Amino acid sequence: KEYAMGDRMRPVPFEELIDRIFSEYRNHGTIFGIHKEDFYKTNPKHSITVFGQKCAVPLGPAAGPHTQLAQNIVSAYMVGGRFMELKTVQIMDHLEIAKPCIDARDEGHNVEWSTEYTLEKAYDEYLKAYFVLHLIQAAFTGKVEEPDFIFNMSVGYNLEGIKQPKMQTYIDSMIDANKSPLFKQYKTSLKNIIEEGNLLEGTDLEGNEKALKALENRISANICPSVTISTMHGCPPKEIEAICSYMLTEKKLNTFVKLNPTLLGYDKVRSILDETGFDHVGLKRESFEHDLQYSDAIAMLHRLVELAKKQNLGFGVKLTNTLGNINDGIVLPGEEKYMSGRALLPISTTVASLLSEEFDGKLPVSYSGGCTVFSVKDLFDTGIRPITMATDMLKPGGYARMAQMAQILDKESLTWDKKDIDAKAVKALSEKAKTAEYSQKAFRGDNQAKVDEELPMFDCYISPCMQACPIHQNIPDYVGLVGDGHYAEALSVIYEGNALPNITCNICDHQCQFHCARMDYE
């Protein structure tokens, strides 16, 4: 029997959110379950700018499951995420999303689109996160500084919907939060919390209280000076251009427009997927024919670049959107699903290569298309920035996977000051991505850690290694105790379920190794 994925998100009130964060850190050294050993500390010598805004780390969560709730955004920040592409909003904000809606066993597939919250609730989540990140930055650095992060709103899917009053209220309140009563309310709440004087008590942050003084007055009402435009697969070129023009001329927003992998054409995309072993991904030629064509895209982008210059604003592309493909119906509902994750890397970088060559590296590229620990430095060194991700953080390790990438860029990359994109480097990366071991389907293989047995409604978590073991050895408790240095207790766990460990270890065929949740760790 399959139990439905939880489909009720319950927002945490602002004051409770702050109390939860600092109480958990005080008592456990964690924030939303992320241990402080996995927190990323920024290097003051390194930063990038995106349309004039400072961003201490060029990484962040893509619009998706990691930017829907305030606690998700906070979690991403703790591990180095500084470019927050907020989950897409649209006028139809009461959609029933069929569950499950995400399948990330290897490459990702999803059947969800925009936020599952109403526009009002989505705005509230983003505003709460915006305040909390200012608070966390001040508390953890002890310094009075400008924000080291960027909030980028993502908006869809057609101009008619965007012009509706509810959407106008949302967009205008992201540009100037003074238009929302919540902004003043949260400023007052934050002021009261700070003036109580005990927020940092009992933590290793004591002594940083001065940085919190009058923090509420240093929080800009301009939450999002930039936007990423998301359109439907198959959206006409004129509609895409109209939305971008509207954002540039009417809303005065720096703008990224998200483009689809279909720009390469059916034959090229099919060839890349087959070459890398993802031949099970079924494509429809007509989906490519009905989507934005490359020649139309180039003409449109040139016009929008010139329009942005006239408005004294920035304009770039987001590469790439997900890839629509035929749904086999085994995991996800519906006829079509949308692919993300590592299978997109050689496709998205090929699109980036073509556009970088066309615009001589002058067209900014915000990237999201299968970036992993193996490719993040190569991507960044081309001049592509920021780099966002979603599918990779749905793997074991979760948010901490981003911290590892941030550390690699900080320690190994020498291209932090790069202003333009190196078209030749992007082309080389796109070729490498087609043949690199980490891009091949065989790299991950088909091994599954999923437990096949029916799980109960409660206490439904079980380690696949423990279930696969013929004697169901309590491996998680053993590993946990050893990790904490409690060796005698760890040994007693072995004895509890295994009276003859010397014999069983000699006849063991190590089924746990083939059913390990760590198979997705690199």
Predicted regions located by residue number:
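Ferredoxin-type iron-sulfur electron-transfer modules and their immediate structural context
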Residues: 400, 404-405, 410-522
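C-terminal helical cap(s) of enzyme catalytic domains, especially alpha/beta-barrels
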Residues: 94-113, 393-421
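Conserved, mostly hydrophobic/aromatic
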Residues: 61, 257, 317, 355, ...
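Glycine-rich beta-to-alpha transition loops that act as phosphate-gripper elements at the mouths
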Residues: 63-66, 323, 363-376
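N-terminal capping/small domains of soluble enzymes
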Residues: 2-250
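Catalytic cores of alpha/beta
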Residues: 70-76, 242-245, 357, 370-389
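Glycine/Thr-rich beta-alpha phosphate-binding loop at enzyme active sites
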Residues: 28-43, 261-361, 396-414
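Glycine-rich phosphate-binding active-site loops on the catalytic face of alpha/beta enzymes
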Residues: 80-93, 259-261, 377-405
